[in-house]
Curated annotation (Swiss-Prot):
Disulfide bonds: 23-106, 195-200, 238-246, 263-290, 264-315, 283-288
Main location: secreted
Species name: Polybia paulista
GO cellular component, one term: extracellular space
An example Gene Ontology molecular-function term: phospholipase A1 activity
Entry's localization field: Secreted
InterPro entries per the UniProt record, alphabetical: AB_hydrolase_fold, Allerg_PlipaseA1, Lipase, Lipase_N, TAG_lipase
Residue positions of the active site: 156 (nucleophile), 184 (charge relay system), 248 (charge relay system)
The UniProt record lists the keyword Secreted: yes
Name of one Pfam family that matches: Lipase
Entry protein name: Phospholipase A1
Family, per entry: Belongs to the AB hydrolase superfamily. Lipase family.
Reaction catalyzed: a 1,2-diacyl-sn-glycero-3-phosphocholine + H2O = a 2-acyl-sn-glycero-3-phosphocholine + a fatty acid + H(+)
Length: 322
């Protein structure tokens, strides 16, 4: 049995199947919350708001559209994703769409039993990915938004949902998304899967992975660049004791701080298990990469170790620039 499931099995393995939530939902349960500089608190995207707010009028279709996709037991109005959305619109006037599929992610009830709905939530990721892809097609064909201007950011299960959206748009004969940022992609039910069954580096032109928990997240290299924050395991500031959920969530906070601040979280080349990372002081723009929205502009590819501090903005390299 996979270690990541063993505790749940020990505690709940003998429960009647009828007690395990199935987290059913359909496409009508998926909401899009839109954030712009004019709608800083977010509005629910509907046909009416599309027309009334003219979100994709000709004068704005050239700007970047960013989808944010939450994970298990979460929702599109989670404070961490709101903070990220607001950082994005302040940074560069992005149009941000937070995807809310909370029913399918088992967030409908605050119950311990919700954790047992994980396998159903895993299956729902494909449906959400297809829904995002279908909406992407609408943006491209009806509103003339370029695929090169669309970015997906997903945390945990949301990272794989983004990957499935990336696969689906290619099936729809669209170009690839410009970027997918996988924030500690969920490990259980995915870490031994091949590319068709998880987020993969071929799902977008550039796939950035931020690893923060080797318990709840995938630990293997799956992106164009894979950043292992504090070696991709226990994160500073998450307490002395075992706290995988805190480390898992740190991936969202790291990217948000990279968006908000000029300080660069520098990744230095690292061959997992086989080498000690080189000191950041030896980095050049050709060998190392800054975590964040502009990672694609650096030529280096592969796996990178990133030292981080316990508190925001988490930079461990004050005064060092690439």
């Amino acid at each position: 049995m996979n270690f990541k499931y063993s505790i749940l099995f020990i505690c709940f393995g003998t429960l009647d199947r009828g007690l395990i939530p199935e987290c059913p939902f359909n496409e009508y349960d998926i909401l899009f919350f839109v954030y712009t500089r004019q709608q800083r608190d977010g509005i629910v995207l509907t046909e009416e708001t599309l027309q009334n707010y003219d979100l994709f009028k000709k004068s704005t279709i050239s700007r970047q559209v960013v989808f944010i996709d939450h994970g298990f037991l979460s929702n599109g109005n989670n404070e961490n994703f709101i903070a990220m959305a607001k950082a994005l619109i302040e940074k560069d006037n992005f149009l941000v769409i937070s995807v809310d599929w909370k029913k399918g992610a088992c967030n409908a009830f605050a119950s311990t039993l919700d954790y047992l709905g994980y396998s159903t939530a895993v299956g729902n990721t494909r449906h959400v990915g297809k829904y995002v892809a279908d909406f992407t097609k609408l943006l491209v064909e009806q509103y003339k938004v370029s695929m090169s201007n669309i970015r997906l950011i997903g945390h945990s299960l949301g990272a794989h949902t983004s990957g499935f959206a990336g696969k689906e748009v290619q099936e729809l004969k669209l170009n690839k998304y410009s970027n997918i940022d996988g924030l500690d992609p969920a490990g259980p039910s995915f870490d031994s899967n091949d590319c068709p069954e998880r987020l993969c580096e071929t799902d977008a032109e550039y796939v950035q992975i931020i690893h923060t928990s080797n318990i709840l997240g995938v630990y293997s290299k799956i992106g164009t660049v894979d950043f292992y924050m504090n070696y991709g395991s226990h994160q500073p500031g998450c307490g002395r004791f075992f706290s995988p959920s805190c480390s898992h969530t740190k991936a969202v906070k790291y990217l948000t701080e990279c968006i908000k601040h000029e300080c660069c979280l520098i990744g230095t080349p690292w061959k997992k298990y086989f080498s000690t990372p080189k000191p950041i002081s030896q980095c050049t723009k050709d060998t190392c990469v800054c975590v964040g929205l502009n990672a694609k502009s650096y030529p280096a590819r592969g796996s990178f170790y990133v030292p981080v501090e316990a508190t925001a903005p988490y930079c461990h390299n004050e005064g060092i620039k690439l």
